[in-house]
Every structure is written in structure tokens, then in C-alpha cells.
Amino acid sequence: MTDDKNNKETTLEKEKVGVYICYCGGNISDHVDVETVRKKIKRIPGVVVARTNMFICSDSGQEMIIEDLNNGSIDRIVVASCSPSLHEMTFRGAVSRANMNPYLYEHVNIREQVSWVHHGEAATDKATRLVAAAVAKAKLLKPLEPIQVKALQHATVIGGGVAGLRAAIDLSDRGFEVMLIEKSPFLGGQVAHLDQIAPFSEKAADLISSLSRLVLQDTSIKIHTRSVVEKFEGYIGNFKLGVKTYPQSVEDQEKLERFDVSDNKRGEFIPFVGVCPGPESSDTEAFTVETGAIILATGFKSYTPRPGEYGYAEFEEVVTLPELIRVLAENETNGNLLKVNGREIRSVALIHCAGSRQIPGIHPEDESGNLNEYCSRTCCSATLQTANIIRKAYPGTRVFEFYRDIRTYGRGQEALYEQASRNKVVFLRFEAENLPKITRNGSSNDFPLRVKVRDVLTFGEEIEVPADLVVLATGMEPNNISELVEMMKLPVGADRFLLEVHPKLRPVELSLAGILLAGTCQAPMDIGEACNAASSAAVKVATLLARGQVELDPFIAEVDLDKCTGTGACVEACLYEGALNLVAIGADGQTVHR
């Protein structure tokens, strides 16, 4: 602590509280009369400053607080704004820059707890009472120092796809020991099932092989495939994971035997050389990992259409885009017509948004009642690239694209759309309320399927397209990591992807310090975005652990046994496994759990 800070804190006076109330751009002020709250709070004894600001978290808002602290007007502050999970660190930093102890600041959530759930006078009244309570607490605040604990110079990456590999490499480059845990037998994740990557048609094999090679050759990276995390405890800098590695199954062995390195034939698991980490144990092994930080790179799974959705599982001629991509990769020769399973394909219908941008009442729910209302972001580019490949390699095969919107964002992506138009791909646009309908063609000598659609581009005219093959551009879904979510108490969004603290200010951090996100476990994204997120997470880990110690908040929770009713709600809500436990005690001649 600096001398200036010591001098300020040894002369702390009571009743010099500054209160700062945020409009939050209308998020708060649309329902809370912020000026009324300010006027009422200003009348509380001890409040010497009461100000409002459109965005307290902005640089100008923080400077306002720092200026009041520096000129001695106040010695404690109360900020009434959005959730402290978003901006508590922001305001602690502002207080520290004014050479004041950051724990002389109290935060009030009047957005999520007030304006988003109350309206009118009720909202204003509740906000006033919450801020008044915070003022009373602020008067009792004392300067505190964070707890310093040793941080292990080790990181664990869970997930061996593109994001996990990138994170492991970046961590190793920064001098950390890394453990990479992957549940499948091989590295590479979903990208290992691709052939060419949009928009520049790089080979997926080249990308995965280069990343895998760096990981496999790095002695500071320990790889465990067929492994899952089964136990978790600890805190930032000192986590402990229980990991179990499963033996190679007979089914896996059969899939391995179908992979011939000499002629590079594709197997079900290994689409190319360079993603197998080496010999696997034939026994189940359990071990413990002590690690300083964890990066979650658990990836995504491709959407599986519901039976009957666009004719899927009803007509054998209806396949998914990943399935077609594998067929195209395995076709060794070009020709006038594309061939699939020995059949000549004269006409292909590509249907966008299968499993994405779903609408309640229109699209079918899964067995858990879920809908994917989000855009998967990569499907349009992948579909357009596939259309271009077909038109170039098989000029006799006609390609029709059925879409709601074409979303080719990012560098080079729009060129795919322009190229498809030049390649004479036919585009038919439908509305969500009128999805394309797939029917069997009655004539055995004609095309097997017909796709019927009301085309927006021709003012709703009903058009029928004959098709030998219908391809569904399936989107992304979060992998099933419910056990990890429950074990680590990870926050999950409405879309079932893991939820970051703040999409702009803390985009790769979770509410539990020391656990970070990388790649598509967080949201649909392309390979470049996944690698960027992985590198960001690696840099954040390096920043947290580089000094060899981490700072913990100097707050110690105590259980008031006289008030405890033994419900266990606190144990369930606590983010830190093992920090709280119900124990049997004697009370009034009986044994109770508290």
C-alpha cells in the first residue's frame, strides 16, 4: 500500500459517503426515477455527494468518482448500477487509482434486482431503500487487504479441439505446464470431420495436423485422451481435479483397424493422419491433477434433425451438410454429375437453418423441450462453399439453395455468395412461417423427391423443385457437459451454452475465478473466432498466474448457528465445492444438521 493511501485511510472520517447512481442508458432510468432516488439519498446524514450519470462505468463516470476521492470530498463510495458481477472490478480499480482502499466501496444492483423486475413507483421506492441500506453499510466499511495465496504454475485445458489445442500451445509458449484432457480417442474435435474450411478452402487436415504436431512434440503439454473430469474442488491458483481415463473399447479398436495410414483411407474417427496422440492404456486409470487455472474448450455438437424434419430419417435421399461434406471429400474423381452412394445426382436442394433460428410453435422441440433460437453463424458460409464445390467439380449437377437469410459475415465470406451466383446456383427465399416441404415423387422414373416452397423473391409464388438429394445445413448445439456444469457450478445461458461474465468487458471469464472459456462451448463461432478466444483465455491465465500468487477477496463467511435452519441452500449456492457443509450437531436435545 502506498504512503498516500496509508495517509488517507488513517484519517478516515465517518459520514463522508459519495453516492453515484447510473441511468444505464435507460435500462435503469426507464423504470426508476433516478433523480428522485438521488434527492432522497442526498438527505441521508453522512452523504456529502450524490450524483447521477448516464454510464457510471464509462471513463468519464469513473473519473468523476476519482476526482471526488482525490479532493477529499468523500472517503467511501456507493455505486448503484447494474450487477456487481459485471462492474465490481471496474469500480474497485477506479477507487484504487485514487489511492484509496478498494474495499471502501459498496455496490448496489438496481438493474437486475429493480428496473428489470419492477416498474413505476415500486421500482423507485425499492431502489431508494436499497441505496439507503448500502449507505448504512458503507459507513461501517473498513480498509482491507486481499489475501495472498500461492498459485500453481500449471493450467488444465478440457477439450482437444481447435480451441483446446490453440490454448494449450499458447500456455506452453508462456512457460506453463499444461494438461490437455480430451474425452474422445483423438484430437481435433469437429474440425477433424471437415475437408475444406470456408471461405478460403484451406484443408482442415493441414490445420489440425499442424496444431496436433505442436502439442504432441511439446514436452510441457501432457495429453490424456478418453479422459473425463469426475471430481473438482479448490479455488483460483489451487484447483484439484479428479480425472479418469477409460480403456480403448472393442468398438474403437474396430474403427482404428479401418484406418490405413499407407493409403490414407478415412475411418469414422480419424479422417487424416496426425490426430492420434499415441498408444492408449488397456486399463481404466484414475489420477488427480493440481492446477492453477482451467480453460474449458468442450466444443459443440452438430444438430441432429428431428425424425421427419424436412424428411430426415423418412427419405434416404435427405442428408445433413456434414454428411455431404464427407462424401465430397471421399470422391476421388470429378465428372459431369455428382455421385452419392452410387447414384447420380442431377439436382441438389440445400436447405439453410436446419436447427438454427428456430421459432416456438413452428419448429419441433427436442426431447427436453429445447429450441435453438440462435443463429449458428457458420452454416451459410459452409453451405455456399459446398454449393460452389459441386458446381465446379460436377457442372451437370444443378444446385438450389433454400434460405431465410444469407449471413456471410467476416473477411472473405461475402465472396462465397457472389461466387455461388456466378456459378449459377439458384436461390429461393422462404419465410419462417412457410418452411419448405419435402415430398416423395410418385413417378419412379423421375426425381425421387420434390421440394415445395413459397418463394419470397417471386412475391410468394409456389415453386416445386425436383431433387435427387436434399441437404440440411445443420447448426451448432452445445455439447452435453451437464456433469461438468453441475460439478463446477458453471453459469449457462438460455441457449444452453456457457455464459461469460460480460460479452465485451470480460468475454472469456466465468463468474468462478480461474475458470475461463475458449471456443464454441461459449457460443457458435467460426474457427478463427474460436482460436482468438482460446488465445485470449491463455493470456488471461498467464496474467493471473505469472506472479506465482493470486489475490483473493478478504471476505470470510461465517455461519450463524442461531439463525441457520439447516435447509442446505447455502451449500447448494456456494461456488466453491467443500467450502460449506452441513454437519450434525446437538440442539435442544435433538440431533440436527446445520
Feature locations, PLM:
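Residues forming the flavin
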Residues: 1-594
